[in-house]
Design a protein with these regions (language model features):
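C-terminal target-recognition/interaction regions appended to catalytic cores
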Residues: 123-291
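Class I S-adenosyl-L-methionine
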Residues: 1-199
Length: 291
């Protein structure tokens, strides 16, 4: 899910994620989570997503985690997050910040989900673990790998004219990407003051791309604009380039309307990350069968 999942809603931080963890607890599962930026692990897009790995309380993996936490307490939970848990072997960490939270979400702390929803508020961090209704969360620092720059996914063949910005459109794009401090009008006639900072225009091709949204390719502030490597003219990304940013093969979405190709990639996960997790789950499943 999106990275803000662990913080929502704004007026009761952590409530929604607490509900998710409590539901897993009631279903007999432990949960480890990590907020991962794909660019930190060598990908071409700064795409942050919250990944949850749940494991049932009748597995050897659960018993190992529960035993360690029972003996070592929060130090044991910390060890699992930084070294021995689900994510650390495939997405290693450099360390952690001195920010953490811990507590209980079980029936002794909250009678039921209604009770939890009304009262629970907590600051969850980018790494965390919930076992037997007890959670521990810490702000982790990723061990950063060399990233792929945006220029590495750009097509170098001649492209259709529809991807290029016309001279008449440049000023409008500059406005969309630029800083704003202006009075705007609501539908009911009232006014409000709108402010936002500037964005790079065009996008820097020596850095990973920003997070793609489902509106990628449309005329919007969030759409990437690059200097074409062949002509140096400004243009938007092509569907193939969007597929590459997520680690899909070229033309993976071919055959659907172009608008939906952009929409699909704006909703997608970064494939190499999911592939690494799939291999990790497969290895843990084999270990479970041998235990």
């Amino acid at each position: 899910n999106v990275d803000r999942l662990i913080k929502s809603p704004a007026w009761q931080k952590g409530r929604d994620f607490s509900i998710i963890l409590r539901c897993f607890y009631e279903a007999g599962y432990a949960v480890e989570w990590r907020v991962i930026n794909a660019a930190d692990y060598g990908e071409a897009q700064r795409r942050r997503r919250t990944f949850l790995f749940a494991f049932r309380n009748d597995t050897a993996l659960f018993r190992k985690a529960a035993d360690l936490i029972c003996v070592e307490g929060l130090k044991g939970a910390h060890q699992l997050l930084l070294q021995d848990g689900f994510f650390a072997p495939i997405f290693p960490l450099y360390g952690f910040e001195r920010k953490y939270s811990e507590g209980w979400l079980d029936e002794f702390r909250y009678l039921d989900l209604k009770d939890l929803s009304a009262a629970q508020s907590c600051h969850f961090y980018t790494s965390g673990l919930m076992v037997n209704g007890r959670f521990y969360s810490v702000e982790s620092i990723p061990l950063q790998f060399p990233y792929k720059p945006l220029c590495s996914v750009l097509e170098i063949t001649p492209l259709a004219e529809r991807y290029f910005l016309s001279a008449a459109d440049i000023d409008h794009w500059r406005y969309l990407k630029g800083a704003k401090q202006e009075t705007r009008h609501r539908r009911n006639g009232s006014t409000y003051f709108f402010s936002e900072g500037s964005m790079a225009f065009p996008d820097r091709s020596d850095l990973p791309a920003r997070t793609m949204l489902t509106s990628e390719g449309s005329v919007s502030r969030s759409t990437h604009v690059v200097a074409d490597p062949r002509t140096q003219r400004l243009r938007t990304l092509t569907p193939i380039e969007c597929e590459r940013l997520n680690g899909f093969p070229d033309d993976w979405t071919a055959g659907m309307p172009e608008r939906l190709r952009y929409f699909t990639m704006g909703n997608a996960l970064v494939v190499p990350l999911v592939k690494a997790m799939g291999k990790r789950i497969s290895a843990l499943t084999e270990d479970e069968q041998r235990s």
